[in-house]
Design a protein with these regions (language model features):
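Residue position in alpha-helical solenoids
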Residues: 18-22, 59, 78, 94-101, ...
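Residue register within tetratricopeptide repeats
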Residues: 10, 47, 86, 125, ...
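Alpha-solenoid helical repeat architecture
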Residues: 24-35, 63-77, 101-114, 138-154, ...
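Structural motif corresponding to the intra-repeat A-B loop/turn of tetratricopeptide repeats
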Residues: 6, 43, 82, 121-122, ...
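Linker/hinge segments immediately adjacent to helix-turn-helix/homeobox DNA-binding domains
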Residues: 352, 356, 390-442, 457, ...
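Residues within the DNA-recognition helix of helix-turn-helix
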Residues: 52, 396, 473-476
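Helix-turn-helix DNA-binding segment
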Residues: 421, 428-475, 479-502
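Internal alpha-solenoid helical repeat scaffolds
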Residues: 1-227, 235
Length: 502
């Protein structure tokens, strides 16, 4: 286990294969099965991982139901990532047959596996009530229990509780860094970067995804690589970096072809469509999302989260009839989710189809997702301008432009600026004071740690790079930030939160 945690999969696998012939004690059998399955999954052998977990659970089910339950929960999560209803149902059925006790602490996790089966067969809305408790339970675990906390972070993302997902993930990343658990860092960065993305913390998401990608590549975890590249493709789309988005999307498709895991593919298909939408290629965006829904992506939560893009693409392409199904999909989920952001986004989508001051006002209620709020401001401002209410339109268009600029959402900022000019207001160039935008993802990671007072050696230990590499990146970052020493860097204080303004 220590070799796997330290990011040494080859050594861990060799030791596990040797141990499998020697171990007889039930708990040791369970831990060994978990380890072998984890190595197989991280290296892309997903079906092998599933079979190892089921076999291991069978061997210890009578003697240690809790250990068997943990393995079956992992098997269910892995099968969900394959968009494989049969395998999820198999894990759920075996969980039902175990003699689990309340004190085993697995009730919420078992319910989540049951809910995953419901989600794959009947859609994600019906799974929400059963999934929420796992996310909230995981937030209360302070240390250890890595499997439950990782599952909890994933589930928090599935139920739209992105701040909970971020809190769990931040704690996991910090703990893994401190304990040198390199092998677990990529999955922790997957959940952290995903949460930051949904919350509009794009610079942090890019930096954390890039760091997770570096470690996943170094430790031979192709599944994590594909997932993180999908997140980076989505961020590239928002920034308007067409070449980078397309290149990362190709890599995600290759990972899917090799492993069958749909997470990265779901992100990359959404990324390509989001790029098309932001650049005004509305019919192309709509066609792309509809095509994605014909494959395994339809079982992923992104099918709910990209429904607003599908609706907007249909409306802007002059094809409102094709917005009906995604609107129903989003409304069904939002009605059960009862989240402020989901209600606001649903209102925005309805306002695009039937513009109205009252509906747009509902779309503008605060909810913690700045990109979605800015898109509502833009949509409202566009409609007001078309209605010849230019004075009313300008504050909304101005607010949209300022948010898009802060987020680095170039194509959206250009659209908002054009609308604002059409509404009779000149627009200024983006502020030159955003010093963090010039930093590379690794420079940003290092600067964020340096400002806390950590030495180069301590930063290197956290990020698994040499002190010399840390020094090199700080040397490159200082002039970009307008400082020449660590003392001046520390004075910047809160200004070094890359997403504080969002």
């Amino acid at each position: 286990m220590a070799a796997a945690d330290a990011g040494l999969p080859e050594r861990a696998q060799a030791l596990a294969e040797r141990a499998v012939r020697l171990v007889e004690e039930p708990r040791s059998i369970a831990r060994l099965a978990e380890l072998r399955a984890r190595i197989a999954f991280e290296r892309g052998s997903v079906h092998t991982a599933h079979d190892i977990l089921l076999s291991g659970a069978d061997r210890v089910a009578e003697l240690d139901p809790a250990a068997a339950g943990l393995m079956l929960v992992d098997a269910g999560r892995n099968a969900w990532q394959l968009s494989d209803p049969r395998r999820v149902e198999e894990a759920a059925a075996r969980l039902r047959r175990l003699r689990l006790r309340p004190e085993d602490g697995l009730d919420a996790a078992v319910d989540a596996v049951e809910a995953a089966a419901v989600s794959l067969n009947a859609g994600p809305a019906g799974a929400l009530p059963a999934m929420r408790p796992l996310a909230r339970d995981a937030r209360g675990i302070e240390r250890g229990s890595y499997g439950l906390r990782i599952n909890g972070a994933f589930v928090a993302g599935l139920v739209g509780e992105f701040e909970t997902q971020r809190q769990i993930s931040v704690a996991l990343v910090e703990e893994c860094r401190t304990l040198g658990m390199t092998g677990l860092l990529p999955i922790a960065y997957v959940t952290l970067a995903g949460a930051e993305l949904y919350l509009g913390r794009f610079r942090s998401a890019a930096a954390d995804a890039a760091e997770g990608l570096r470690i996943a590549t170094d430790t031979g975890q192709p599944h994590r690589t594909g997932y993180l590249e999908g997140i980076l493709a989505w961020i590239a789309a928002v920034e308007g970096d067409e070449d980078r988005c397309a290149g990362l999307a190709v890599r995600c498709a290759d990972h899917f072809a090799a492993t069958g895991i749909a997470n990265g593919l779901a992100w990359s298909e959404w990324a390509l469509a989001a790029l098309d939408l932001s650049l005004g290629r509305h019919t192309r965006a709509l066609d792309r999302l509809e095509a994605a829904l014909a494959g395994p992506v339809r079982h992923q939560i992104q099918a709910v989260y990209f429904a607003p893009d599908q609706i907007e693409a249909a409306v802007r392409a002059g094809l409102p009839d094709r917005a009906k199904e995604p609107l129903e999909r989003l409304a069904e989920w939002a009605d059960v989710a009862r989240l402020d952001w989901a209600d606001a986004v649903l209102a925005r989508c309805r306002a695009l189809l039937e513009p109205d001051d009252e509906i747009f006002s509902a779309a503008l209620r605060p909810h913690g997702r700045p990109l979605e709020r800015a898109r509502a401001e833009l949509g409202y401002g566009e409609w007001l301008r078309r209605e010849r209410r230019r004075r009313d339109a300008r504050p909304h268009l101005r607010a949209a432009l300022e948010t898009f600029q802060r987020l680095g959402a170039g194509p959206w900022a250009r659209r908002a600026a054009a609308e604002l000019r059409a509404a009779g207001e000149a627009t200024a160039a983006p502020a030159a004071s955003d010093r963090l935008a010039a930093l590379s993802p690794q420079e940003l990671q290092i600067v964020r740690l340096a400002v806390t007072g950590l030495t180069n050696r301590e930063i290197g230990a956290r990020l698994f790079v040499s002190p010399k590499t840390v020094s090199h990146h700080l040397y490159r970052a200082f002039p970009k930030l307008g400082v020449s020493s660590r003392v001046e860097l520390a004075r910047l204080g809160p200004d070094l939160d890359p997403d504080a303004a969002t």
